[in-house]
Amino acid sequence: MARSVWKGPFVDGYLLKKAEKVREGGRSEVIKIWSRRSTIMPQFVGLTFGVYNGSKHIPVSVNEDMVGHKFGEFAPTRTYYGHGADKKAKRK
C-alpha cells in the first residue's frame, strides 16, 4: 500500500543534512547511509550514496529517474546463485 499523500515523502533528517554538507563543499564523495527506507528527493540528484545492504555499502549514483523511489530499491540484500544443478545429469 502506498504512503498517504497528505503525509508527504519520508526522509531521515540526518540524510538531508549530509547531502547539503556535500553540496556546499563541492566534493564528490560517497555519502554512507543506512536508511534504506528514505525516499530519494530532487536535491539528491547528482550525488552518490553508499546504501547499506546488511553487509556492505553499495554505491548508488542518483539520477532524475530515481526521484520518488526508496534507496533500498537500488541495493539488493539477497544474492541469487541459481537453483542447484541436476545431480542425475552430473553423474553421467
UniProtKB/Swiss-Prot annotation:
GO CC annotation terms, alphabetical: cytoplasm; small ribosomal subunit
GO biological process per UniProt: ribosomal small subunit assembly; translation
Molecular functions (GO terms): rRNA binding; structural constituent of ribosome
Gene3D superfamilies, per database record: 30s Ribosomal Protein S19, Chain A (3.30.860.10)
Keyword Ribosomal protein: yes
Top-rank lineage group of the source organism: Bacteria
Record keywords: Ribonucleoprotein, Ribosomal protein, RNA-binding, rRNA-binding
Functional description taken from the UniProt entry: Protein S19 forms a complex with S13 that binds strongly to the 16S ribosomal RNA.
PANTHER family: RIBOSOMAL PROTEIN S19P FAMILY MEMBER, SMALL RIBOSOMAL SUBUNIT PROTEIN US19M
UniProt family annotation: Belongs to the universal ribosomal protein uS19 family.
Record's protein name: Small ribosomal subunit protein uS19
Organism: Rhizobium rhizogenes (strain K84 / ATCC BAA-868) (Agrobacterium radiobacter)
Gene name of this polypeptide: rpsS
